[in-house]
UniProtKB/Swiss-Prot annotation:
Record-given protein name: DnaJ homolog subfamily C member 14
Cysteines paired by S-S bonds: none
Transmembrane segments: 305-325, 327-347
Record field: compositional bias (Basic and acidic residues): 1-11, 203-218
Gene3D superfamilies hit by this protein: DnaJ domain
Pfam family, one: Jiv90
Record field: compositional bias (Basic residues): 193-202, 219-228, 691-703
Physiological role: Regulates the export of target proteins, such as DRD1, from the endoplasmic reticulum to the cell surface.
InterPro entries: DnaJ_domain (IPR001623), J_dom_sf (IPR036869), Jiv (IPR032843), Viral_replicn-host_int_reg (IPR052317)
PROSITE patterns per UniProt: DNAJ_2
CDD domains listed in its UniProt record: DnaJ
An annotated GO BP: protein transport
Compositional bias per record (Polar residues), positions renumbered to this chain: 121-133, 673-684
Length: 703
């Protein structure tokens, strides 16, 4: 076991089993390391060949002995410096032997760590004071954490003021350690050394008060060490800032040097150029001028060649495009001419074929059927039907859902109403003001609200709210908005009250039934009247035959096969035309300024005339022939109507005069010797006219 020097203290390793001094062999510790750590002077070789590191104890790392612990057997062996060896304890020899064994183990471990890492695993802790301390200072006590650090305090430097330092350092208990980018506490081997908190441990003792005297105690655990660590870290932060500034200054210095070098290179290059230009001769300048001229001429020639090539290419391409466009235009013009020619030929062929097949009659019948009141009545019923209205609403809704229609509607700012249409407030006010003169009893609330009569209560309420927002005087600044809102309110009062709504619906149903009956009667009467007007009286069968109005003008009414054209016709002209390769013959007549098809009447009269003649073969006379006169005679317009057909003709604004009743012999005018009892034959009843029929002179056709 190495002997302890009275004025020195060895670095001790802390173990939970007991404390031992740290000693190394002479060959294991490098003198350079000792000089580096500042321990060369404090290193000493023990008599047994062991090299010991001594540490001068100071007042900061010493602790005075406590005699109370010596005399009190309950405290066990003392932890701090004990009494003089002369007093001695019976267990001192045993403790020394144990310490020597532990010292040897620690020395071997330190040697092994130094050989592996290449750096010492211990650092010297120089004393903070110059006092020698007391002889026989024992090894420091072990820390509670077992980190292997221990220290001893000099009893000359320990004072009760340390208790006051404990109170001053309470503010450092909760502070977090400062962090910097670089760790200044690392050693050169890269191995993390023990922190100062672990290096400087103070003995923790209980405060013992004996006979009113306060025993000096060491400061709190880790407090002084933490204070030093905070101070070192602040110092390290300052050093780090200084180091960063030094690095920045060094980088700026190198940049400045590089800039100066670059400027020098440019200056050197310029000098070389100037020197080279100074050595040039006049002939060199002439050669340079010639060389520049040659290259300029070459570049000019190349440019002219490129320009000529590009211009020729452009003109060739343009000419080719023009020729292609001309050819395409010629083909299009030819195709258009062929198409128009085919259309013209097809139209002529269709017209000729239709004339041969009698398509004009069918076309006239089709147009007459389309214009018939029955078809109009059916269309009206279809429009008033509920499925048709639902289909219309569905189509309107689909149209309004289209993206471009929605965008246009949003730009215009229109407001939708319940019926699906979009109107502006001004338009709604104008629409409501058109019904201002309608009495309230005759007001149609559904028309006012813009919904159908079959709308539900929800649809009615929705329509009323939307219209109320648009036409309310507070929302709409129209001068007559209040009047329009009153009309809307009156309509809402009718449909919102169940009794008034039921009464209105009953009234509407009665009006609809009456109007439907009247419309049916009038439509039937109109059909009968039109049928009566489009019939001809037949003197042969005493019946009526239908006539069909043709879509022909009087100026081009008759077809002539000799001239292959249409000739004009006069009032009363009667002619025939053939169709279907001459298999069908149709009879026409010009009556009342219109061309009629009277084939039925002519067939009953058994008239046989040649078709498609140049001249009119027959002429129908609608007037009376005065005895002693010859030629064409027509009744005067002043003659009164003879039958119901004349009366109906006047009702339907047919010009008065002879009617096309199919009778070639009108009633003769009363002579001067005749009495007033004589009547025209047309006014005589059928039963009485039969015996008098023989007295008539028949001249049906006059040329």
């Amino acid at each position: 076991m190495a002997q302890k020097h009275p004025g020195e203290r060895r670095l001790c390793g802390a173990h939970r089993s007991g404390g031992t001094s740290l000693s190394t062999s002479g060959s294991s510790v490098d003198p350079e390391i000792l000089s580096f750590s500042g321990l060369r002077d404090s290193a000493e070789t023990a008599p047994n060949g062991t090299r010991c590191l001594k540490e001068h104890s100071g007042p900061k790392y010493t602790q005075p002995p406590n005699p109370a612990h010596w005399s009190d057997p309950s405290h066990g062996p003392p932890r701090g410096p004990g009494p003089p060896r002369g007093g001695g304890y019976p267990d001192e020899s045993e403790t020394g032997s144990e310490e020597s064994g532990v010292d040897q183990e620690l020395s071997r471990e330190n040697e092994t760590g130094y050989q592996e890492d290449g750096s010492p695993s211990f650092l010297s802790i120089p004393s903070a004071c110059n006092c020698q301390g007391s002889p026989g200072v024992p090894e420091g006590t072990y820390s509670e954490e077992g980190d292997g650090s221990s220290s001893s305090l000099c009893h000359h430097c320990t004072s009760p003021a340390l208790g006051e330092d404990e109170e001053l350092e309470e503010e450092y208990d909760d502070e977090e350690p400062l962090k910097f980018p670089s760790d200044f506490s690392r050693v050169s081997s890269g191995k993390k050394p023990l922190s100062r908190r672990q290096k400087h441990r103070f003995l923790i003792k209980e405060d013992v008060r004996d006979s009113g005297r306060r025993e000096p105690k060491a400061p709190g655990r880790h407090r002084l060490a933490r204070k030093r660590s905070q101070t070192d870290k602040r110092r390290g932060l300052g050093l780090w800032g200084v180091e960063e500034l030094c690095q920045l200054g060094q980088a700026g210095f190198w940049w400045l040097i590089e800039l100066l070098v670059l400027v020098g290179e440019y200056v050197e290059t310029c000098g070389h150029l100037i020197y080279a230009c100074r050595k040039l001769k006049g002939s060199d300048l002439d050669l340079f001028r010639v060389w520049v001229g040659v290259w300029a001429r070459r570049l000019g020639g190349w440019a002219r060649m490129m320009f000529q090539f590009l211009s020729q290419s452009f003109f060739c391409v343009v000419g080719l495009l023009i020729r292609i466009l001309r050819v395409v235009g010629a083909f299009l013009l030819l195709a258009l001419a062929l198409f128009l020619g085919c259309l013209q030929l097809g139209w002529r062929f269709s017209v000729g074929l239709g004339n041969r097949l009698g398509w004009r009659d069918k076309t006239a019948w089709l147009f007459s059927w389309l214009g018939s009141p029955a078809l109009h009545h059916c269309l009206t019923l279809l429009k008033d039907s509920r499925p048709w209205q639902q289909l219309v609403r569905l189509i309107q809704w689909g149209w309004q859902e289209l993206p471009w229609v929605k965008q246009r509607t949003k730009k215009q700012g229109n407001a939708p109403v319940a019926s699906g249409r979009y109107c502006q407030p001004e338009e709604e006010v104008t629409r409501l003001l058109t019904m201002a003169g309608v009495p309230e009893d005759e007001l149609n609330p559904f028309h006012v609200l813009g919904v159908e009569a079959t709308a539900s209560d929800t649809e009615l309420k929705k329509a009323y709210r939307q219209l109320a927002v648009m036409v309310h005087p507070d929302k709409n600044h129209h001068p007559r908005a209040e009047e329009a809102f009153k009309i809307l309110r009156a309509a809402w009062d009718i449909v919102s009250n169940p009794e008034r709504r039921k009464e209105y619906e009953m009234k509407r149903m009665a009006e609809n039934e009456l109007s439907r009956s009247v419309n049916e009667f009038l439509s039937k009467l109109q059909d009968d009247l039109k049928e009566a007007m489009n019939t001809m009286m037949c003197s042969r069968c005493q019946g009526k035959h239908r006539r069909f109005e043709m879509d022909r003008e009087p100026k081009s009414a008759r077809y002539c096969a000799e001239c292959n054209r249409l000739h004009p016709a006069e009032e009363g002209d009667f002619w025939a035309e053939s169709s279907m390769l001459g298999l069908k013959i149709t009879y026409f007549a010009l009556m009342d300024g219109k061309v009629y098809d009277i084939t039925e009447w002519a067939g009953c009269q058994r008239v046989g005339i040649s078709p498609d003649t140049h001249r009119v073969p027959y002429h129908i006379s609608f007037g009376s022939r005065v005895p002693g006169t010859s030629g064409r005679q027509r009744a005067t317009p002043e003659s009164p109507p003879a039958d119901l057909q004349d009366f109906l003709s006047r009702i339907f604004q047919v010009p008065p005069g002879p009617m096309s009743n199919g009778n070639f012999f009108a009633a003769p005018h009363p002579g001067p010797g005749t009495t007033s009892t004589s009547r025209p034959n047309s006014s005589v009843p059928k039963g009485e006219a039969k015996p008098k029929r023989r007295k008539k002179v028949r001249r049906p056709f006059q040329r």
